[in-house]
Amino acid sequence: NQLASSLIKSGYEIKGKRFFDTICFKASGWKEKSEAMNFNFRDFGDGLVGISLDETTTESDIENILDVFNAKLNLDHSKSIPDNLVRGSRFLSNSVFTKHRSETEMLRYMHKLELKDLSLNTSMIPLGSCTMKLNATTEMKPVTWPEFSNVHPFAPTNQVGGYHTLINELGDRLVQLTGFDAISMQPNSGAQGEYAGLMTIRAFHKANNQQERDICLIPSSAHGTNPASAIMAGMKVVVVECDDQGNIDEVDFEKKATEHRDNLSAIMITYPSTHGVFEPSIKQLCEIAHDNGGQVYMDGANLNALVGLCEPGQFGVDVMHINLHKTFCIPHGGGGPGMGPIVCKDHLSKFLPSHTSISSPNENSIPAVSAAPFGSSSIL
Protein backbone atom coordinates (compact mmCIF):
# COMPACT_ATOMS: atom_id res chain seq x y z
CA ASN A 1 0.00 0.00 0.00
CA GLN A 2 2.96 2.32 0.56
CA LEU A 3 3.86 2.08 -3.13
CA ALA A 4 0.29 2.84 -4.18
CA SER A 5 -0.12 5.82 -1.84
CA SER A 6 3.24 7.21 -2.95
CA LEU A 7 2.26 6.99 -6.62
CA ILE A 8 -1.13 8.57 -5.93
CA LYS A 9 0.51 11.45 -4.07
CA SER A 10 2.78 11.95 -7.08
CA GLY A 11 -0.20 12.28 -9.42
CA TYR A 12 -0.72 8.73 -10.69
CA GLU A 13 -4.16 7.12 -10.76
CA ILE A 14 -4.27 3.57 -9.41
CA LYS A 15 -6.81 1.28 -11.08
CA GLY A 16 -9.20 -0.17 -8.49
CA LYS A 17 -9.68 0.72 -4.84
CA ARG A 18 -8.80 -2.65 -3.33
CA PHE A 19 -5.73 -4.71 -4.09
CA PHE A 20 -3.50 -7.32 -2.51
CA ASP A 21 -0.03 -7.60 -4.05
CA THR A 22 -0.48 -6.01 -7.49
CA ILE A 23 -1.31 -2.50 -8.63
CA CYS A 24 -1.97 -1.11 -12.12
CA PHE A 25 -1.71 2.47 -13.29
CA LYS A 26 -1.11 4.59 -16.39
CA ALA A 27 2.48 5.68 -17.04
CA SER A 28 4.84 6.40 -19.92
CA GLY A 29 8.58 6.57 -20.57
CA TRP A 30 9.47 4.10 -17.84
CA LYS A 31 10.67 0.99 -19.67
CA GLU A 32 14.31 1.86 -20.37
CA LYS A 33 14.85 3.27 -16.90
CA SER A 34 13.26 0.26 -15.20
CA GLU A 35 15.45 -2.20 -17.11
CA ALA A 36 18.53 -0.13 -16.33
CA MET A 37 17.63 -0.48 -12.64
CA ASN A 38 17.06 -4.26 -13.02
CA PHE A 39 13.27 -4.10 -12.74
CA ASN A 40 10.80 -5.88 -15.01
CA PHE A 41 7.28 -4.45 -14.82
CA ARG A 42 4.31 -5.72 -16.77
CA ASP A 43 3.52 -3.69 -19.86
CA PHE A 44 -0.12 -4.21 -20.87
CA GLY A 45 0.52 -2.44 -24.17
CA ASP A 46 -2.00 0.38 -23.72
CA GLY A 47 -0.01 2.62 -21.41
CA LEU A 48 -1.01 0.55 -18.39
CA VAL A 49 1.78 -0.82 -16.21
CA GLY A 50 1.45 -3.54 -13.57
CA ILE A 51 3.69 -4.00 -10.53
CA SER A 52 3.58 -6.95 -8.12
CA LEU A 53 5.30 -7.02 -4.72
CA ASP A 54 5.90 -9.90 -2.33
CA GLU A 55 7.29 -10.57 1.14
CA THR A 56 10.87 -10.08 -0.07
CA THR A 57 10.23 -6.48 -1.15
CA THR A 58 11.99 -3.92 1.05
CA GLU A 59 11.41 -0.21 1.57
CA SER A 60 14.60 0.39 -0.38
CA ASP A 61 13.09 -1.55 -3.31
CA ILE A 62 9.98 0.61 -3.15
CA GLU A 63 12.07 3.78 -3.21
CA ASN A 64 13.94 2.54 -6.28
CA ILE A 65 10.68 1.61 -8.00
CA LEU A 66 9.30 5.06 -7.28
CA ASP A 67 12.46 6.58 -8.72
CA VAL A 68 11.64 4.94 -12.06
CA PHE A 69 8.41 6.95 -12.14
CA ASN A 70 9.94 10.13 -10.64
CA ALA A 71 7.84 9.71 -7.51
CA LYS A 72 8.73 10.17 -3.84
CA LEU A 73 8.15 7.82 -0.92
CA ASN A 74 5.05 8.65 1.10
CA LEU A 75 5.57 7.73 4.76
CA ASP A 76 1.97 8.57 5.64
CA HIS A 77 -0.04 5.72 4.15
CA SER A 78 -3.11 3.75 5.21
CA LYS A 79 -3.73 0.04 5.07
CA SER A 80 -5.32 -1.31 1.89
CA ILE A 81 -7.20 -4.17 3.58
CA PRO A 82 -10.69 -3.00 4.65
CA ASP A 83 -11.57 -3.39 8.32
CA ASN A 84 -14.29 -5.96 7.61
CA LEU A 85 -11.67 -8.29 6.09
CA VAL A 86 -9.10 -7.98 8.86
CA ARG A 87 -8.96 -11.16 10.94
CA GLY A 88 -10.31 -10.72 14.44
CA SER A 89 -10.19 -14.31 15.68
CA ARG A 90 -7.21 -15.99 17.31
CA PHE A 91 -4.75 -17.96 15.21
CA LEU A 92 -2.12 -20.65 15.89
CA SER A 93 -4.21 -21.55 18.92
CA ASN A 94 -3.43 -25.29 18.91
CA SER A 95 -1.20 -26.31 21.80
CA VAL A 96 1.45 -27.66 19.42
CA PHE A 97 2.45 -24.06 18.67
CA THR A 98 3.23 -23.23 22.30
CA LYS A 99 4.26 -26.44 24.11
CA HIS A 100 7.79 -26.75 22.67
CA ARG A 101 9.60 -23.86 24.32
CA SER A 102 13.25 -24.87 24.08
CA GLU A 103 15.52 -25.82 21.21
CA THR A 104 15.88 -29.34 22.64
CA GLU A 105 12.12 -29.83 22.91
CA MET A 106 11.65 -28.61 19.35
CA LEU A 107 14.45 -30.87 18.09
CA ARG A 108 12.90 -33.92 19.76
CA TYR A 109 9.44 -33.07 18.47
CA MET A 110 10.71 -32.75 14.90
CA HIS A 111 12.58 -36.05 15.22
CA LYS A 112 9.39 -37.70 16.47
CA LEU A 113 7.60 -36.48 13.35
CA GLU A 114 10.48 -37.65 11.19
CA LEU A 115 10.17 -41.20 12.54
CA LYS A 116 6.57 -41.30 11.30
CA ASP A 117 7.63 -40.51 7.75
CA LEU A 118 7.70 -43.29 5.16
CA SER A 119 10.69 -42.47 3.00
CA LEU A 120 13.41 -44.04 0.90
CA ASN A 121 15.71 -44.50 3.91
CA THR A 122 13.18 -46.87 5.54
CA SER A 123 11.07 -48.32 2.73
CA MET A 124 9.91 -48.10 -0.85
CA ILE A 125 7.45 -45.26 -1.43
CA PRO A 126 4.26 -46.92 -2.74
CA LEU A 127 2.76 -43.85 -4.42
CA GLY A 128 3.35 -44.31 -8.14
CA SER A 129 6.25 -44.38 -10.53
CA CYS A 130 7.12 -40.69 -10.13
CA THR A 131 7.85 -41.11 -6.41
CA MET A 132 9.57 -44.50 -6.51
CA LYS A 133 12.95 -43.08 -7.35
CA LEU A 134 15.73 -41.12 -5.69
CA ASN A 135 17.10 -37.94 -7.23
CA ALA A 136 20.85 -37.74 -6.90
CA THR A 137 22.28 -34.68 -5.16
CA THR A 138 23.94 -33.65 -8.42
CA GLU A 139 20.46 -33.45 -9.96
CA MET A 140 18.88 -31.58 -7.06
CA LYS A 141 21.59 -29.01 -6.37
CA PRO A 142 21.30 -26.98 -9.62
CA VAL A 143 17.65 -26.24 -8.78
CA THR A 144 18.89 -24.05 -5.93
CA TRP A 145 21.21 -21.98 -8.12
CA PRO A 146 19.79 -18.45 -8.48
CA GLU A 147 20.56 -18.49 -12.21
CA PHE A 148 17.79 -21.11 -12.49
CA SER A 149 15.52 -20.48 -9.53
CA ASN A 150 15.36 -16.67 -9.48
CA VAL A 151 14.23 -16.16 -13.08
CA HIS A 152 10.64 -15.01 -13.51
CA PRO A 153 8.65 -17.13 -16.01
CA PHE A 154 7.58 -13.98 -17.86
CA ALA A 155 11.08 -12.48 -18.07
CA PRO A 156 11.74 -10.81 -21.46
CA THR A 157 13.25 -13.14 -24.04
CA ASN A 158 16.39 -11.02 -24.42
CA GLN A 159 17.18 -11.60 -20.73
CA VAL A 160 16.91 -15.40 -20.73
CA GLY A 161 18.99 -16.52 -23.70
CA GLY A 162 20.58 -19.32 -21.69
CA TYR A 163 17.20 -20.72 -20.67
CA HIS A 164 15.95 -20.71 -24.26
CA THR A 165 19.10 -22.51 -25.40
CA LEU A 166 18.60 -25.14 -22.69
CA ILE A 167 14.91 -25.57 -23.55
CA ASN A 168 15.51 -25.78 -27.30
CA GLU A 169 18.39 -28.25 -27.01
CA LEU A 170 16.45 -30.48 -24.61
CA GLY A 171 13.41 -30.31 -26.87
CA ASP A 172 15.43 -31.34 -29.92
CA ARG A 173 16.84 -34.33 -28.04
CA LEU A 174 13.42 -35.46 -26.82
CA VAL A 175 11.97 -35.23 -30.32
CA GLN A 176 14.86 -37.29 -31.67
CA LEU A 177 14.61 -39.90 -28.90
CA THR A 178 10.89 -40.45 -29.35
CA GLY A 179 10.63 -40.29 -33.14
CA PHE A 180 8.29 -37.30 -33.37
CA ASP A 181 8.60 -33.95 -35.18
CA ALA A 182 7.70 -31.19 -32.70
CA ILE A 183 7.42 -30.53 -28.98
CA SER A 184 5.69 -28.23 -26.50
CA MET A 185 7.37 -27.77 -23.12
CA GLN A 186 4.34 -26.05 -21.62
CA PRO A 187 2.45 -28.80 -19.73
CA ASN A 188 3.39 -29.09 -16.04
CA SER A 189 2.49 -32.75 -15.60
CA GLY A 190 1.48 -35.90 -17.41
CA ALA A 191 -2.21 -35.21 -16.80
CA GLN A 192 -1.83 -31.69 -18.17
CA GLY A 193 0.07 -33.18 -21.11
CA GLU A 194 -2.90 -35.47 -21.79
CA TYR A 195 -5.24 -32.49 -21.82
CA ALA A 196 -2.90 -30.48 -24.08
CA GLY A 197 -2.51 -33.39 -26.50
CA LEU A 198 -6.24 -34.03 -26.74
CA MET A 199 -6.97 -30.32 -27.23
CA THR A 200 -4.37 -30.32 -30.00
CA ILE A 201 -6.22 -33.23 -31.64
CA ARG A 202 -9.53 -31.40 -31.31
CA ALA A 203 -8.02 -28.32 -32.96
CA PHE A 204 -6.74 -30.53 -35.79
CA HIS A 205 -10.22 -31.94 -36.44
CA LYS A 206 -11.77 -28.47 -36.25
CA ALA A 207 -9.29 -27.17 -38.84
CA ASN A 208 -10.41 -30.02 -41.11
CA ASN A 209 -14.08 -29.08 -40.61
CA GLN A 210 -14.67 -32.23 -38.58
CA GLN A 211 -15.53 -30.70 -35.22
CA GLU A 212 -18.20 -33.38 -34.79
CA ARG A 213 -15.40 -35.85 -33.97
CA ASP A 214 -15.68 -36.03 -30.18
CA ILE A 215 -15.49 -39.74 -29.29
CA CYS A 216 -12.42 -40.97 -27.41
CA LEU A 217 -11.76 -44.71 -27.07
CA ILE A 218 -10.00 -45.60 -23.81
CA PRO A 219 -9.11 -49.13 -22.56
CA SER A 220 -10.55 -50.24 -19.22
CA SER A 221 -6.95 -50.68 -17.99
CA ALA A 222 -6.18 -46.97 -18.41
CA HIS A 223 -4.98 -44.65 -15.67
CA GLY A 224 -7.79 -42.55 -14.21
CA THR A 225 -6.41 -39.32 -15.61
CA ASN A 226 -7.07 -40.54 -19.18
CA PRO A 227 -10.89 -40.37 -19.10
CA ALA A 228 -10.73 -37.25 -16.92
CA SER A 229 -8.55 -35.46 -19.49
CA ALA A 230 -10.81 -36.56 -22.33
CA ILE A 231 -13.88 -35.18 -20.56
CA MET A 232 -12.09 -31.89 -19.87
CA ALA A 233 -11.17 -31.68 -23.55
CA GLY A 234 -14.85 -31.91 -24.43
CA MET A 235 -14.82 -35.52 -25.60
CA LYS A 236 -17.15 -38.42 -24.85
CA VAL A 237 -15.45 -41.52 -23.48
CA VAL A 238 -16.16 -45.00 -24.85
CA VAL A 239 -14.48 -47.76 -22.84
CA VAL A 240 -12.73 -50.63 -24.65
CA GLU A 241 -12.55 -54.01 -22.90
CA CYS A 242 -9.32 -55.77 -21.88
CA ASP A 243 -8.61 -59.49 -21.44
CA ASP A 244 -7.50 -61.22 -18.24
CA GLN A 245 -3.84 -60.44 -19.02
CA GLY A 246 -4.47 -56.71 -19.36
CA ASN A 247 -4.25 -56.67 -23.17
CA ILE A 248 -6.70 -54.57 -25.16
CA ASP A 249 -9.45 -56.71 -26.67
CA GLU A 250 -8.73 -56.16 -30.37
CA VAL A 251 -12.15 -57.38 -31.48
CA ASP A 252 -13.97 -54.99 -29.12
CA PHE A 253 -11.58 -52.18 -30.08
CA GLU A 254 -12.18 -52.57 -33.82
CA LYS A 255 -15.91 -52.94 -33.28
CA LYS A 256 -16.18 -49.67 -31.35
CA ALA A 257 -13.79 -47.79 -33.66
CA THR A 258 -15.92 -48.84 -36.64
CA GLU A 259 -19.17 -48.09 -34.82
CA HIS A 260 -18.02 -44.52 -34.10
CA ARG A 261 -16.05 -43.95 -37.31
CA ASP A 262 -18.10 -40.84 -38.22
CA ASN A 263 -17.25 -39.06 -34.97
CA LEU A 264 -14.13 -40.82 -33.67
CA SER A 265 -11.71 -38.16 -32.42
CA ALA A 266 -8.96 -40.11 -30.68
CA ILE A 267 -7.86 -43.22 -28.88
CA MET A 268 -5.77 -43.06 -25.73
CA ILE A 269 -3.37 -45.90 -25.11
CA THR A 270 -0.75 -46.33 -22.39
CA TYR A 271 2.30 -48.24 -23.62
CA PRO A 272 3.36 -50.24 -21.75
CA SER A 273 0.02 -50.27 -19.97
CA THR A 274 -0.73 -49.64 -16.32
CA HIS A 275 -0.60 -53.44 -15.93
CA GLY A 276 2.95 -53.44 -17.30
CA VAL A 277 1.77 -55.01 -20.56
CA PHE A 278 3.42 -54.25 -23.90
CA GLU A 279 0.53 -54.45 -26.36
CA PRO A 280 1.80 -56.75 -29.16
CA SER A 281 -0.76 -55.21 -31.52
CA ILE A 282 0.15 -51.56 -30.91
CA LYS A 283 0.74 -50.83 -34.61
CA GLN A 284 -2.48 -52.53 -35.67
CA LEU A 285 -4.45 -50.55 -33.07
CA CYS A 286 -3.01 -47.31 -34.43
CA GLU A 287 -3.91 -48.33 -37.98
CA ILE A 288 -7.49 -49.13 -36.97
CA ALA A 289 -7.81 -45.71 -35.32
CA HIS A 290 -6.46 -43.91 -38.41
CA ASP A 291 -8.62 -45.95 -40.80
CA ASN A 292 -11.66 -44.72 -38.87
CA GLY A 293 -10.63 -41.06 -38.86
CA GLY A 294 -9.18 -40.89 -35.36
CA GLN A 295 -5.85 -39.75 -33.97
CA VAL A 296 -3.70 -41.73 -31.54
CA TYR A 297 -2.70 -40.32 -28.15
CA MET A 298 -0.09 -42.31 -26.24
CA ASP A 299 0.23 -41.91 -22.49
CA GLY A 300 3.99 -41.84 -21.95
CA ALA A 301 3.89 -42.34 -18.18
CA ASN A 302 5.76 -45.64 -18.50
CA LEU A 303 8.11 -44.53 -21.26
CA ASN A 304 11.13 -45.39 -19.13
CA ALA A 305 10.56 -49.06 -19.97
CA LEU A 306 11.12 -48.62 -23.71
CA VAL A 307 12.77 -45.29 -24.56
CA GLY A 308 16.20 -46.90 -24.93
CA LEU A 309 14.85 -49.58 -27.27
CA CYS A 310 12.38 -48.00 -29.68
CA GLU A 311 10.70 -44.78 -30.79
CA PRO A 312 6.94 -44.46 -30.15
CA GLY A 313 6.71 -42.18 -33.17
CA GLN A 314 7.29 -45.25 -35.33
CA PHE A 315 4.29 -47.12 -33.91
CA GLY A 316 1.75 -44.84 -35.58
CA VAL A 317 1.23 -42.60 -32.55
CA ASP A 318 0.32 -38.96 -33.34
CA VAL A 319 0.95 -37.26 -30.00
CA MET A 320 2.37 -38.34 -26.64
CA HIS A 321 3.36 -36.80 -23.34
CA ILE A 322 6.65 -37.46 -21.57
CA ASN A 323 6.93 -37.42 -17.78
CA LEU A 324 10.38 -35.87 -17.48
CA HIS A 325 10.27 -36.35 -13.70
CA LYS A 326 9.94 -40.10 -14.30
CA THR A 327 11.69 -41.21 -17.47
CA PHE A 328 14.46 -38.61 -17.47
CA CYS A 329 14.90 -38.26 -13.71
CA ILE A 330 14.68 -34.48 -13.44
CA PRO A 331 14.29 -33.18 -9.84
CA HIS A 332 10.86 -34.02 -8.46
CA GLY A 333 11.34 -34.97 -4.83
CA GLY A 334 8.32 -37.22 -4.28
CA GLY A 335 5.59 -34.80 -5.21
CA GLY A 336 7.19 -31.53 -6.27
CA PRO A 337 6.64 -29.75 -9.59
CA GLY A 338 6.71 -32.01 -12.63
CA MET A 339 7.04 -31.60 -16.38
CA GLY A 340 4.82 -33.30 -18.97
CA PRO A 341 5.81 -31.92 -22.39
CA ILE A 342 4.03 -33.31 -25.43
CA VAL A 343 5.69 -34.45 -28.64
CA CYS A 344 3.72 -34.82 -31.85
CA LYS A 345 3.86 -35.53 -35.55
CA ASP A 346 4.22 -32.68 -38.03
CA HIS A 347 0.52 -32.48 -38.96
CA LEU A 348 -0.34 -31.55 -35.35
CA SER A 349 2.58 -29.20 -34.70
CA LYS A 350 0.80 -25.99 -35.70
CA PHE A 351 -1.86 -26.62 -33.06
CA LEU A 352 0.51 -26.91 -30.07
CA PRO A 353 -0.20 -24.55 -27.12
CA SER A 354 0.59 -20.86 -27.41
CA HIS A 355 1.18 -18.31 -24.64
CA THR A 356 0.61 -14.58 -24.31
CA SER A 357 4.19 -13.93 -23.14
CA ILE A 358 5.85 -15.36 -26.26
CA SER A 359 5.11 -14.92 -29.94
CA SER A 360 3.70 -17.95 -31.74
CA PRO A 361 4.20 -18.48 -35.48
CA ASN A 362 1.00 -20.53 -35.63
CA GLU A 363 -2.35 -18.77 -35.62
CA ASN A 364 -4.10 -22.12 -35.12
CA SER A 365 -2.37 -22.84 -31.79
CA ILE A 366 -4.61 -23.83 -28.89
CA PRO A 367 -4.64 -21.44 -25.89
CA ALA A 368 -2.17 -21.84 -23.04
CA VAL A 369 -2.60 -24.91 -20.83
CA SER A 370 -0.18 -23.65 -18.16
CA ALA A 371 0.41 -20.34 -16.41
CA ALA A 372 4.03 -20.22 -17.62
CA PRO A 373 5.12 -20.60 -21.26
CA PHE A 374 7.55 -23.44 -20.52
CA GLY A 375 5.90 -25.03 -17.49
CA SER A 376 8.14 -25.69 -14.49
CA SER A 377 11.22 -24.65 -16.45
CA SER A 378 13.51 -24.32 -13.41
CA ILE A 379 13.72 -28.12 -13.14
CA LEU A 380 14.61 -28.77 -16.77
Predicted regions and their residues:
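Gly-rich Lys/Arg/Thr-decorated short loops/hinges at beta-loop-alpha junctions or inter-strand turns
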Residues: 14-17, 86-87, 145-158, 176, ...
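Conserved phosphate/anionic-ligand binding catalytic regions in large, soluble enzymes, centered on
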Residues: 52, 56-57, 118-139, 186-197, ...
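Short acidic-aromatic active-site loops that bind/stabilize oxyanions
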Residues: 96, 156-168, 187, 243, ...
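Structural motif of enzymes handling amino- and sulfur-group chemistry
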Residues: 1-13, 366-380
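Conserved C-terminal alpha-helix-loop-beta "cap" of PLP-dependent enzymes
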Residues: 2-68, 73-80, 107, 113-118, ...
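Conserved N-terminal alpha-helix of the aminotransferase class I/II PLP-enzyme fold
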Residues: 6, 102, 148-188, 193
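Conserved PLP-enzyme active-site core in the AAT-like
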Residues: 7, 20, 24, 161-162, ...
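Flexible inter-domain linker/hinge segments
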Residues: 59-126, 130-138, 143-149
